Design a protein with these regions (language model features):
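Structured beta-strand/loop patches that form or line metal/cofactor-binding pockets in enzymes
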Residues: 1-45, 50
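Active-site mouth loops of central-metabolism enzymes
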Residues: 105-120, 139-140, 168-174, 217-219
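Short, acidic/polar
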Residues: 116-128, 174-182
Length: 219
């Protein structure tokens, strides 16, 4: 099985107006590109990235190769997704079987929001609850105090609601992260933290595991 053609399909997925206004401090895009990987066997694999299509040189590097050439590869994961899709279809297996043991049988769905003022954060949580969501992931940045945001959420969220923060490494290191994370773990609605410090700081992650109760994980 060889990849013979890659078709980029550019989509425009707009934010709701209130989110767009709150997201001015991020250089984000409403453009999403879906890739269809065609093969000489007729199978089609699907990949995706946020933003415009990758350049033709990168896409061309996949042409003429087998999807199996990209197992645990060093290419763009957005494109390797399509290769795993193809491998799973070719073998008649779910793609996770090519990656290791199954961890869970389901994946939680949640609301998403950029970092906002505590007042707007509370209002956004109420929108999420009204639409049936019981959890959300919020970008956490220095624009607003994440502790104040969390207290605002705690005041309006139903008892079973959960919030997880995505810092994208913005707490930098353990010394800066620990005081903030220790305050967050006192707030019941906070259930998880994504990449509080830089991913390569192995010793820092080990120390967080020793000292922090809140679950945390890589981006």
């Amino acid at each position: 099985m060889k990849i013979i053609e890659i078709e980029p399909i550019v989509l425009h997925v707009p934010y709701e107006d209130r989110i767009r206004k709150q997201y001015h401090h991020f250089n984000m895009t409403e453009q999403v590109t879906v890739y269809k990987f065609y093969t000489d066997t007729g199978l089609i694999g699907i990949g995706e990235n946020v933003g415009p299509p990758f350049d033709s040189e990168l896409l061309d590097s996949y042409l003429g190769t087998s999807p199996f050439d990209h197992v645990m590869g060093s290419g763009r994961f957005n494109l390797d997704i399509a290769c795993y899709d193809l491998m799973g279809k070719h073998l008649g297996l779910p793609a996770w079987k090519l990656m290791g043991q199954q961890v869970r049988h389901w994946v939680a769905m949640g609301w998403w929001m950029p970092c906002m003022s505590p007042e707007n954060t509370a209002a956004e949580v109420q929108v999420a609850v009204e639409r049936g969501y019981r959890g959300l992931k919020c970008k956490a940045r220095a624009f607003y105090d994440v502790i104040e945001q969390s207290h605002a959420i705690q005041e309006v969220a139903p008892p079973d609601f959960r919030v997880e923060y995505d810092f994208n490494g913005s707490l930098i290191n353990v010394e800066k992260a620990l005081p903030i994370l220790r305050e967050l773990e006192k707030i019941p609605v906070v259930k998880g933290v994504e990449e509080p410090i830089f991913a390569y700081d192995i010793e820092g992650w080990r120390r967080l595991h020793q000292e922090i109760r809140i679950p945390f994980y890589l981006h």
